[in-house]
């Protein structure tokens, strides 16, 4: 088992635990929990806002691309040795069996949330943004050529049997409803937390936005810096329930006869860690 499998497996287990903890926290709501919240300075029944820097790593597998409504297509990548981009020349697409890969997002990956806390239980509405640029599978003579692919109806490419798709990135903007539980302590400012969420992701592939049902798990710790401010560090996993993306438009239809659109079947998820803060309003 590699580290990614261990990480995602742990978060899956945490998601199950979150559901149980939320139910027990909401139903029990014992006097002890209220006493803990009061003594620890985290008052129940308060609104909060949060923000986090969340470096993310893509988990994009089985990126199967083909012509829309066709069972079989062939995907060819641009020749690495060609120093110019000319998609009208079939011979420039010399790499058979080409598939796209995507890089990690360490810069433009952020989360923001607004929520309500009551004792150790919290519910929040969270928005996030992820951008994963296309990753070159080696050194290309022309920058950006790794974003181009020719989709053909036959194994051999000709002037009239292909169109060109350009995918230079995948972006995922999501809105999630999370249920969280904080394990509060009377004598420590540090509280472990676990969250489980469901919501919508808006996935942009080549300017075609597709809405998907999404899920998210989060685990971490919060440190009560002041009664109103908590510093947060943790990990997350974000996945989608469906793998189908249709009507990806052609970058250039060249001399292709027919509707130049592609479909993609891919498991698109991301995981990573977050560093941020929550601001409580009494």
Curated annotation (Swiss-Prot):
InterPro entries: Msp4_OMP-like, OMP/PagP_b-brl. Coiled coil: none annotated. It holds the Pfam family Surface_Ag_2. Residues 1-29 form the signal peptide. Keywords: Signal. The keyword Lipid metabolism does not apply. It comes from Anaplasma marginale. This is Major surface antigen 4. Belongs to the surface antigen msp4 family. Disulfide bonds: none annotated. The lineage of its organism: Bacteria, Pseudomonadati, Pseudomonadota, Alphaproteobacteria, Rickettsiales. The keyword GTP-binding does not apply.
């Amino acid at each position: 088992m590699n580290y990614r499998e261990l990480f995602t497996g742990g978060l899956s287990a945490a998601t199950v635990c979150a559901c149980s903890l939320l139910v027990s926290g909401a139903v029990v709501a014992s006097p002890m929990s209220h006493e803990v919240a009061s003594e620890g300075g985290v008052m129940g029944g308060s609104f909060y806002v949060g923000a986090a820097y969340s470096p993310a790593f893509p988990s994009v597998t089985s990126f199967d691309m083909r012509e829309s409504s066709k069972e079989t297509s062939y995907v060819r990548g641009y020749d690495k040795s060609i120093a110019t981009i000319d998609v009208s020349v079939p011979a420039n697409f010399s790499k058979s069996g080409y598939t796209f890969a995507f890089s990690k997002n360490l810069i433009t990956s952020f989360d923001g949330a607004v929520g309500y806390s009551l004792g150790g239980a919290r519910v929040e509405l969270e928005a996030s943004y992820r951008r994963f640029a296309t990753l070159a599978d080696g050194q290309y003579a022309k920058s950006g050529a790794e974003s181009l692919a020719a989709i053909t109806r036959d194994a051999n490419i000709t002037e009239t049997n292909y169109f060109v798709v350009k995918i230079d990135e995948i972006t995922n903007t999501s809105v999630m409803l999370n249920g969280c539980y904080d394990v509060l302590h009377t004598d420590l400012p540090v509280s472990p937390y676990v969250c489980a969420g469901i919501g919508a992701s808006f996935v942009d592939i080549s300017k075609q936005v597709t809405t998907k049902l999404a899920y998210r798990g989060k685990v971490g710790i919060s440190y009560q810096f002041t009664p109103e401010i908590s510093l947060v560090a943790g990990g997350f996993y974000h996945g989608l329930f469906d793998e189908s993306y249709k009507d990806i438009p052609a970058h250039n239809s060249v001399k292709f006869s027919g509707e130049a659109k592609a479909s993609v079947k891919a498991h698109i998820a991301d995981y990573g860690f977050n560093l941020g803060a929550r601001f409580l309003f009494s």
